[in-house]
């Protein structure tokens, strides 16, 4: 049973006086939206230089960086969070160790957070291709893997959830071939021939890690968490192989939510994308700023200006202050620095960028949204800091959302890759969040109780404040 809210409890005495004439809770009309759901994404930089190192670091509870990551998450207390750059290994032992040794342990007064459910899966980073993908004459470098990486699983990701993951309905697109996307931006050489041979393209996956659709059951309403981490649009040449791959990786989700995905085939052979009435939230580090950085033109706009997507436009005061203090490339940026989510080199470039996103479907009510980026005079600045960073060069991005409620309840489907653990106190796991958070650093955008964030202001605000 869900706990009573403060508002409900305050009404009980009056309700009891008129019990004979008042409708019972069972007779009351259900809300048209879900309760407030706090959803977050965080590139936590929990990647390591060799396989097994992350597992070793998490075996004990004294790793400083992992403690900072956990405290950052505890300060926001999201119901669902995607963590990018969390090295993957097949038995998910690191996922469990981070939960038990860090998330469920208090840090500097922050309350422990319990996630009974989690998902992690294999990725293309570090998987040897056997081909010279970067044209340097070698076939064994990290750039010759299907996704840049020194070993299979490096730069993977994990999703933690307070709600059940419908594991038998998870869809992944790790092995979908880039060439099979209609109109794919395949790179070419200066003479117009393909950068990659037909032999390479017949094995080349579009996703540099994986793209995964995780249906999560939120009290009978299914929310599709669409998680990915496209390749950075940098470290290439005139052929723009990484820029173009980044563009098409972003396009995959744009097509998936817009009824343009008939060509898409998942790793189990099922075709197509989401139905028009599906609830979803796109999460991840997409390595693409709408106006600055190295992106192929229009890359992230495929999502930000999509009629199917709401830009929650999270902000922070810390991002604005750091752009001013760090100067350099930031002084010529066009994106409002309040939207920045990554703190990168400023001399000469690229400067701080907006590259991490929480993007729900149209019809979702946005209560608040923010970037966890404290200012330097805030005690919590120790969690973000300056280079070399104590935690990550990315900032956690969060949004408090009310999704349209489904008419047909759905049932959870636990499996071996979806684990349930008791809370630290031994009580039943808390699977809901009131959404009442205080003390979150930064400026949060609120649109009022029950207000719908209008799509028409997405790009207007970005450009008018640039």
What are these language model-derived features?
Residues 27-157, 187-204, 219-223, 236-238, ...:
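N-terminal, active-site-proximal structural segment of metallo-dependent hydrolase catalytic domains
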Residues 167-171, 216, 244-250, 255-282, ...:
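Metal-dependent phosphoester-hydrolase catalytic domains
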Residues 438-461:
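A cross-kingdom C-terminal cell-surface attachment/processing module
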Residues 143-185:
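A substrate-binding/cap region within the structured catalytic cores of diverse enzymes
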Residues 405-434:
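C-terminal low-complexity, Ser/Thr- and acidic/Pro-rich disordered "stalk" regions positioned immediately N-terminal
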Residues 462-466:
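Cytoplasmic C-terminal tails of single-pass
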Residues 226-245:
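Active-site His/acidic residue clusters
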Residues 9-20, 450:
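Bacterial N-terminal signal peptides
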């Amino acid at each position: 049973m869900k706990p009573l809210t403060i508002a409900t409890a305050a009404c009980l005495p009056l309700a009891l006086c008129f019990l004979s004439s008042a409708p019972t809770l069972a007779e009351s009309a259900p809300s048209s939206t879900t309760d407030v759901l706090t959803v977050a994404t965080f590139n936590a930089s929990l990647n390591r230089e060799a396989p097994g190192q992350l597992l070793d670091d998490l075996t004990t509870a004294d790793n400083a960086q992992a403690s900072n990551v956990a405290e950052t998450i505890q300060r926001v207390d999201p119901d669902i969070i995607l963590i990018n750059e969390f090295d993957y290994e097949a038995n998910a032992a690191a996922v469990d160790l981070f939960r038990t040794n860090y998330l469920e342990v208090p840090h500097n007064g922050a309350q422990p957070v319990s996630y009974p459910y989690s998902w992690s899966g294999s990725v293309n980073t570090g998987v040897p291709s056997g081909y010279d993908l970067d044209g340097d004459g070698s076939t064994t470098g990290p750039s010759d893997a299907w996704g840049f990486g020194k070993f299979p699983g490096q730069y993977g990701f994990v999703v933690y959830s307070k709600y059940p993951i419908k594991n038998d309905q998870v869809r992944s697109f790790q092995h979908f071939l880039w060439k099979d996307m209609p109109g794919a931006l395949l790179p070419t050489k200066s003479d117009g021939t393909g950068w990659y041979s037909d032999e390479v393209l017949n094995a080349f996956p579009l996703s540099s890690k994986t793209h995964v659709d995780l249906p999560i059951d939120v009290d009978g309403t299914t929310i599709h968490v669409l998680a990915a981490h496209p390749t950075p649009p940098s470290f290439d040449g005139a052929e723009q192989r990484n820029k173009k791959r980044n563009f098409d990786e972003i396009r995959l989700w744009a097509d998936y939510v817009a009824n343009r995905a008939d060509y898409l085939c998942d790793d189990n052979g099922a075709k197509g994308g989401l139905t028009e009435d599906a609830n979803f939230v796109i999460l991840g580090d997409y390595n693409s700023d709408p106006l600055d950085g190295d992106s192929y033109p229009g890359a992230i706009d495929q999502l930000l200006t999509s009629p199917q997507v709401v830009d929650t436009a999270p902000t922070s005061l810390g991002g604005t202050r750091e752009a001013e203090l760090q100067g350099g490339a930031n002084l010529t940026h066009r994106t409002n620095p309040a939207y920045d989510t990554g703190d990168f080199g400023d001399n000469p470039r690229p400067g701080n960028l907006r590259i991490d996103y929480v993007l729900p479907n149209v019809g979702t009510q946005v209560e608040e949204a923010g970037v966890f980026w404290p200012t330097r005079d805030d005690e919590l600045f120790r969690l973000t800091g300056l280079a070399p960073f104590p935690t990550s060069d990315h900032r956690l991005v969060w949004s408090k959302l009310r999704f349209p409620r489904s008419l047909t309840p759905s049932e959870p489907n636990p499996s071996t890759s979806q684990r349930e653990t008791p809370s630290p106190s031994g009580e039943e796991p808390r699977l809901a969040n009131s959404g009442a958070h205080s003390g979150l650093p930064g400026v949060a955008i609120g649109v009022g109780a029950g207000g719908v964030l209008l799509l028409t202001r997405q790009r207007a605000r970005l450009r008018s404040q640039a």
